[in-house]
Amino acid sequence: MMTSVTDLGSILGVWAHPDDEAFLSGGIMAAARDAGQAVAVVTATLGEHGTPDPVAFPPHELTEVRRHELDRSLATLGVHTHRMLGYRDGGCAAVAPEHGASRIMQAIDEFEPDTVLTFGPDGYTGHPDHRAVSGWVTDAVLATNSHARVLHATAEHDFLSRFHDIHDRFNVFFAGKPSVNRITDMAIHAEWGGSVLDRKVLALAASGVRQGP
């Protein structure tokens, strides 16, 4: 297990929707930027269907709201390098895998990361967009012969038990998800405090439409 975020080197996060980056890697990105590491993020969709109130926030209006929220989240974490792929929210599984992978290959060639952060094959929450993006990343890294290590977001039992009620209330996970791993089996595990935790919370709060009142 790596003991420090600095062991990750330069980082490329590849996620499906705005707020995935904050929820699954906000602490890592903030700490890495504090340490002077290069961090870039790729987002597959604008999450235009990601609201509990689609009447108040129809997709054609929500697009710009989510874009603004994502910009604010990344700025809070100190990340200023971002690429948007522009796929339809909820439609990543319908994208030809080779097309999605080619877009990730472009990002890998551009940023030459030491580490790529993304979803595991189960998509962490089980969302089809997440699972599709995970496959694109795997195919892209293999196709580019990149030296980058790929790390998947995962969960451990104590975390799931501690926040079980919250996860249920907000329907965070599909049935049977996420996969559970022991901390000793993880590539890196950290518990954040201080300014790093503060910034992760603020980055999550930026996604106000997604979270609801």
Question: Can you say where each PLM-predicted feature lies in the sequence?
Answer:
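Active-site rim/loop-helix segments in enzyme catalytic domains that contact anionic ligands
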Residues: 1-112, 139, 143
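Metal-dependent de-N-acetylase/amidase catalytic core
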Residues: 2-12, 90, 94-213
